[in-house]
Amino acid sequence: MAQKIYIPDTLANWKWPPHLNPHYPEVKRESAAWLASFGAFSPKAQDAFDRCDFNLLASFAYPLAKKEHLRSGCDLMNLFFVIDEYSDVAEADEVQRQADIVMDALRNPHKPRPKGEWVGGEVTRQFWELAIKTASPQSQKRFIATFDTYTQSVVQQAADRTHSYIRDIKSYFEVRRNTIGAKPSFALLELEMDLPDKVIEHPIIQDLSILTIDMLHLGNDIASYNLEQARGDDSHNIVTIAMNQLKTDVAGAMKWVDNHHKELERKFNESFEKLPKWGEPIDSQVARYVDGLGNWVRANDQWSFVSERYFGKKGPEIMKSRWVTLLPKERTEDIGPQVVDDSLL
């Protein structure tokens, strides 16, 4: 009899309900066509990639964004997963080369990319060339700084994978806070804002940011674990790490995640009530920014079940029952998402 996995409902009491940006259908068409134009994946993998619908993730994550800012969000989500899919099957030195290309493209968005270069360079350049047309200077500065940190963490993840290195919980959290790509995503919450460094760097804002990131990566890991273990790429997943460190099984690891998530939620709500005041117009911008953090947690969870990324067409059903069947090992070296049991690796 096939083994069943229970996925805890970590957001049962989360006070942010899901909201979808009304520009989603139009912007999805634009961003999806833009990404497909690069031919980054085989036709089969491109079809699977389209079914993941990362534009839906952006539209849940930025429900109040103007059309042009939602386009930046959609393009970014698609860029993230181009980077992920190529780096997931590459050695650390190749991933470092990809990271260097991405950062050069971000810092020089108007400079043509070299002929024959890895496709991620031009995807990055075009994304950023369009985004900066409507992005505030502060959001641009923070985006580039946080994206640099993100790309280097992806290199570290590749090195860990190459050496079959399974981290302990503490060091995993430190690395995962960057590999999930949340910090650059938060910079897009600021596209219309002009928040000074002293505000973003305030301890309470920083605490809220880290707590949000930790809830995001825990939610992502419990949703993606089944596919990642089937792919043989689960060493960078909290379920595997908790099983290894706590000497427990999948059910025990999921229970640990659920309990830890509840503690993160409690701390987030406490810090949310302690937001400092700077006066207007900063206070209104901070309120929107922090509300955006809370919404991101819900957006990630909603997309995980509504899209076909992790559960195929069974997502809404699994969102209610919380039970999934453990998938068999299906190791693949192909670039791009693969279909396994109607879900997408």
From Swiss-Prot:
One Pfam family matching this protein: Terpene_syn_C_2
UniProt-recorded Gene Ontology molecular function terms: metal ion binding; terpene synthase activity
InterPro entries per the UniProt record, alphabetical: Isoprenoid_synthase_dom_sf, SANT/Myb, Terpene_cyclase-like_2
Binding site for Mg(2+) 3: N220, S224, E228
Residues given in the record as (2E,6E)-farnesyl diphosphate binding sites: R309, Y310
Keyword check for Transmembrane helix: no
Myb-like domain ranges (all copies): 277-327
EC number: 4.2.3.135
GO biological process: isoprenoid biosynthetic process
Reaction equations catalysed: (2E,6E)-farnesyl diphosphate = Delta(6)-protoilludene + diphosphate
Residues annotated as binding Mg(2+) 1: D84
Family label: Belongs to the terpene synthase family.
Record function comment: Terpene cyclase that catalyzes the cyclization of farnesyl diphosphate (FPP) to delta(6)-protoilludene.
Protein name per the record: Delta(6)-protoilludene synthase HETIRDRAFT_454193
Source organism of this protein record: Heterobasidion irregulare (strain TC 32-1)
